[in-house]
Amino acid sequence: RSSFSLPQEFTWGNYENAFSKLNVLTAYKYSFIISGTVTIGVMIFASLMAFGLTRYRFKGKGFVHALIVASLMFPVFATIIPVYKMMVQWHLLSNCIAVILPQIAGNLSFATIVMTGFMQSIPLEMEEAAYMEGANVFKVFRKIIVPLCRPSLATVAIFSFLWSYNDLFVQKIMMREPKKFPISTLLEQISSQYGTDFGLMAASVTIIVIPVMIVYVLLQKNIIKGLTAGAVKG
């Protein structure tokens, strides 16, 4: 038989082994705690930063915007050593916060740029009318800006969730206890010095990909709209 031929019979045994040997449910719990918190945090901070950059004039505004753009040139690998030392000093290793904080910081620049481009396309007249009706800045942001920014917020949510969910580098460094490993970190446990169970690995990869596919399918309509907002000015 060829290595590429279909199996003689199909079985769910590898999936059963994945749940029994790898403690997948616990790993899912930590993954969703980390990725969900990162996604919500990035959406909140990025929308607030974009609102300030697009609606207010202040000294050093251009420098702040340039700093946000420039920060995209520095990958997480370049800053992981000082971040790791900081987490050690704060006694946060093997804590979800040790992964959440660096991931929020790593996603914030891109998310702010996406949100800024979208907010620049929102007419100021809508906000001015709300101010004339007696609304304060917090109500304008919550009632007008946030609902209109749903496409860009969906884009930010998708990219933040996927990046956090698949980020093996930060998770592996900050999470030292195997019982607290997120789902993507479990793949390393399948490969060992004694060999690799490819059936178990294939089943585990399928289990890991399922949440990613669900998130993408639910929010895919807003990706292009959110990324291209503000690209054309009329």
Describe each PLM feature range.
Residues 1-234:
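A structural signal for multi-pass alpha-helical bundles of membrane permease subunits
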